[in-house]
């Protein structure tokens, strides 16, 4: 059978959804592992990653069941949801690639002061730095209460903002690139689901509609 046939479309859609399932399980597993080892204590971060993993897993299961059973309703909603996810993810990925250092500084500064003291302390110890940018009285107070190891080795520590900026540009490019890649796999999933949904099952009753 040629690759444009019913079986090929079905197998391709199943394979794509198996990949989505593995990615969803990986996200859930990594979040649980990070929480178990104490690498990340913020319940909001862990909960967000797990929620994304569960959401991706549910979409993949719906797509897989729809593909295996040639279920018209499931495939329709799968196409709609995956299309909406593509629009959202494509926009976020483009934003990650377009953000400049000035915007990154603003985002880091705003994020730093909405974090809990515990989260800031963990970041300072993890990156071995103290304070953010030392631009305000609050920054100086934050530096004074820092518990990073670098304070015991030298009279001054590198500011955390400098280290964050150094890594954030690379991280944003990686996130943007990975996001764009998955965005195009989602478009592929929508196209495969639409194509497969409109194909007639050769094993079905010849007089039945699709």
From Swiss-Prot:
State which residue ranges cross the membrane: 13-33, 45-65, 73-93, 174-194
- Principal localisation: membrane
> Which residue positions carry a glycan here?
100, 109, 117, 134
Listed as disulfide-bonded, the cysteine pairs are none
Query: Which Pfam families does this UniProt record tie to the protein?
Result: Tetraspanin
Q: Which InterPro entries does this entry report, sorted A to Z?
A: Tetraspanin/Peripherin, Tetraspanin_animals
Where is the protein found, in the record's own terms? Membrane
Q: Membrane topology per the record?
A: Multi-pass membrane protein
Keywords, in A-Z order: Glycoprotein, Membrane, Transmembrane, Transmembrane helix
Give the protein family.
Belongs to the tetraspanin (TM4SF) family.
Q: Does the keyword Cell division apply?
A: no
> Which residue intervals are topologically Extracellular?
34-44, 94-173
Name of this protein: Tetraspanin-31
């Amino acid at each position: 059978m040629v690759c444009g046939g019913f079986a090929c479309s079905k197998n391709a859609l199943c394979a794509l959804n198996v990949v989505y399932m593995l990615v969803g399980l990986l996200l859930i597993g990594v979040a649980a592992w990070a929480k178990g080892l104490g690498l990340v204590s913020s319940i909001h971060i862990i909960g967000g990653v797990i929620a994304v993993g569960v959401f991706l897993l549910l979409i993949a299961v719906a797509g897989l069941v729809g593909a295996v059973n040639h279920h018209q309703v499931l495939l329709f909603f799968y196409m709609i949801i995956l299309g909406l996810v593509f629009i959202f993810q494509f926009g976020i990925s483009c934003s990650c690639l377009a953000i400049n250092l000035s915007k990154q500084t603003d985002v880091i500064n705003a994020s730093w002061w909405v974090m809990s003291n515990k989260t800031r302390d963990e970041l300072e110890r993890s990156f071995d730095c103290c304070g953010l940018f030392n631009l305000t009285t609050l920054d100086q107070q934050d530096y004074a209460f820092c518990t990073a190891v670098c304070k015991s080795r030298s009279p001054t520590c590198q500011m955390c903002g400098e280290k964050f900026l150094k890594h954030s540009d690379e991280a944003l490019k990686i996130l943007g690139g990975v996001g764009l890649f998955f965005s195009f796999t989602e478009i592929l999933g929508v196209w495969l689901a639409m194509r497969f949904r409109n194909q007639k099952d050769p094993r079905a009753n010849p007089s039945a509609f699709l």
